[in-house]
């Protein structure tokens, strides 16, 4: 437990260099754990970002910065404050608790009822958030696309890019991806979202067919450059397989075919998020070569 006196206040100009140094150290440490991450940052660019970001707080003790906290946005739809992986640092869980306590009233005033933080998936870090009441809900895994896919596909397997005319098929496939026991989205919201994805020229809505029957899907979108991440990169989402075909290799064939398509298009890294509620999902993505790099922790704000 941190025993030195700690004072938390809004981040000011004299804190910027110290916060930048902490962010750079965290990014370098994360890259040392995963070759799919980049360990160096553009210092001037980082300094400009830290100088301008708001709301942000620092924890200081005996003249030095011992922690910081940044909120990148308030999601008014889900009413959550979002914290990126390099948006928090702390020398001790008690420092993190002090930062979160200071931020809570500002988040409430902005309309948030809770927070969600993407943190580096390192046990001591995840445990520190847990001591502050946050719950691990998802992981983000990364896989390098250095080599061609080494798995074959079943006879009659075909992967194609869907379009607006595939809306009803895509809606059926998308429902198969709903987490078991979870609350499914409103059907009109689902229809609007799937239709938007099918119409977006920058997004690949891919449907896998076996013998001419649509049995699986994946949505692939290019990722904008992010601090600490390799580029060009793609994000996989909405991966779904016909429940009657699960466990027969169709999901593996889908993912490997999608990744090979991305590799041939020039992408060097793929990432995917998965919920931790189902250990089978975790095993599947780890088995496909995705290494967890970040964890999503969430908590409602105390009343």
Question: Which stretches of residues belong to each language-model region?
Answer:
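Conserved acetyl-CoA-binding loop-helix of GNAT-fold acetyltransferases
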Residues: 92-106, 238-241, 247-260, 264, ...
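Conserved donor-binding loop and adjoining core beta-sheet/short helix segment
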Residues: 35, 39-98, 210, 218-239
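Acyl-donor-binding surface of acyltransferase catalytic domains
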Residues: 1-4, 87-155, 294-302
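A short beta-loop-alpha structural element at the N-terminal edge
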Residues: 7-21, 30-33, 158-172
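Conserved active-site tyrosine of GNAT-family acetyltransferases
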Residues: 127-129, 285, 290
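Flexible, substrate/cofactor-facing loop regions flanked by secondary structure
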Residues: 155-234
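Conserved GNAT-fold acetyl-CoA-binding loop/helix
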Residues: 27-47, 178-194
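Conserved hydrophobic beta-strand within the GNAT/NAT acetyltransferase core sheet
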Residues: 115-119, 236, 270-274
């Amino acid at each position: 437990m941190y025993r030195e006196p700690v004072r938390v206040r809004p981040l000011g100009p004299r804190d910027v260099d110290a916060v930048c140094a902490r962010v750079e150290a965290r990014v370098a440490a994360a890259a040392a754990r995963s070759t799919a991450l980049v360990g160096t940052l553009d210092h001037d660019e980082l300094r400009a970002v830290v100088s301008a970001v708001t709301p942000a707080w620092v924890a200081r003790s005996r003249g030095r910065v011992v922690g910081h906290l940044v909120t990148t946005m308030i999601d008014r739809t889900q009413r959550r404050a979002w914290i990126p992986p390099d948006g928090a640092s702390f020398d001790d869980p008690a420092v993190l608790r002090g930062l979160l306590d200071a931020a809570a009233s500002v988040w409430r005033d902005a309309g948030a009822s809770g927070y969600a933080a993407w943190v580096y998936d390192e046990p001591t870090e995840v445990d520190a958030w847990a001591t502050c009441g946050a719950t691990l809900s998802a992981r983000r895994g990364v896989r390098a696309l250095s080599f061609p896919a080494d798995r074959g596909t079943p006879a009659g397997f075909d992967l194609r890019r869907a379009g607006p005319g595939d809306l009803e098929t895509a809606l059926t496939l998308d429902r198969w991806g709903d987490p078991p026991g979870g609350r499914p989205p409103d059907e009109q919201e689902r229809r609007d979202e799937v239709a938007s994805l099918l119409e977006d020229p920058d997004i690949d809505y891919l449907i896998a067919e076996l013998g001419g029957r649509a049995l699986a899907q994946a949505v692939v979108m290019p990722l904008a450059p992010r601090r600490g991440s390799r580029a060009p990169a793609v994000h996989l989402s909405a991966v779904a397989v016909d429940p009657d075909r699960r466990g027969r290799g169709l999901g593996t064939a889908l993912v490997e075919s999608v990744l090979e398509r991305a590799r041939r298009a020039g992408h060097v890294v793929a990432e995917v998020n998965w919920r931790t509620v189902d250990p089978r999902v975790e095993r599947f993505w780890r088995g496909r070569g995705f290494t967890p790099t970040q964890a999503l922790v969430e908590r409602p704000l105390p009343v």
